[in-house]
């Protein structure tokens, strides 16, 4: 899986061959196909493992439950940007997945949607739990809309770590986004 993860991250789905994976992993094709029927199944398994890592990373512990939800969201997001700086293959996997989906590959597009929905549902549940007023309709956005807005901003910042911003700038940007979305603030235009 490590070799497949590396190849899919660096070369994308179409740029990665089963031959290159088995050669690098020192496996036979038969051994690979024993576990995965197709290259697409292997790709899905790699991405599902990424989803599981992300969910585990953001799952609050009992200690986290003592924090203010906004602080938890800001701190965990910032910590994740540090992870991206160390392991950029994770973000590269997602960027390749989104690009392939945008290019119209229906199978990959469907998979991208399913994986994103899985992450989104966890985010919606977290928003409902952390910010009960949103669930009761107190805000302008529904829990799903708030989760989508937060995750879209988070993904945008994530894609820029190491390219257009460093980890500290990413953390500052994330703090700004979360505080503005959750707490509001005075207008910059005023």
Question: Predicted regions span which residues?
Answer:
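Helix-turn-helix
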Residues: 3-41, 45-46
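Solvent-exposed, amphipathic alpha-helical segments
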Residues: 3-10, 57-61, 93, 97, ...
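Solvent-exposed, non-membrane alpha-helical residues enriched in polar/charged side chains
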Residues: 5, 9, 44, 48, ...
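Short, flexible helix-adjacent loops and helix caps
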Residues: 12-13, 55, 59-66, 85, ...
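Hydrophobic alpha-helical connector segments
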Residues: 45, 59-89, 137-150, 189-190
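Short, basic, alpha-helical segments at the C-terminal edge of helix-turn-helix-like DNA-binding modules
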Residues: 48-54
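Amphipathic alpha-helical packing segments from all-alpha helical-bundle domains
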Residues: 59, 67, 71, 86-89, ...
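Amphipathic C-terminal alpha-helical segment
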Residues: 83-86, 100-103, 125, 129, ...
């Amino acid at each position: 899986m490590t070799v497949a993860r590396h190849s899919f991250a660096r070369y994308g789905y179409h740029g990665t061959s089963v031959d290159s994976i088995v050669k690098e992993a020192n496996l036979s094709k038969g051994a690979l196909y024993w576990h995965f029927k197709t290259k697409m199944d292997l790709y899905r398994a790699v991405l599902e493992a990424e989803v599981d890592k992300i969910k585990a990373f953001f799952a609050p512990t009992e200690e986290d439950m003592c924090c203010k939800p906004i602080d938890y969201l800001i701190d965990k997001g910032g910590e994740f940007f540090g992870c991206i700086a160390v392991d950029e293959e994770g973000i590269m996997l997602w960027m390749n997945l989104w690009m392939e989906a945008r290019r119209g590959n229906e199978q990959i597009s469907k998979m991208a949607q399913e994986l994103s929905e899985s992450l989104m549902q966890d985010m919606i549940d977290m928003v409902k739990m952390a910010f009960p007023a949103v669930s009761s309709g107190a805000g302008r956005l529904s829990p799903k809309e708030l989760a989508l807005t937060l995750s879209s901003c988070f993904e945008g910042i994530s894609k820029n770590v190491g390219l257009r911003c460093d980890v500290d700038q990413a953390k500052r940007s994330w703090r700004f986004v979360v505080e503005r979305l959750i707490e509001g603030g005075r207008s910059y235009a005023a």
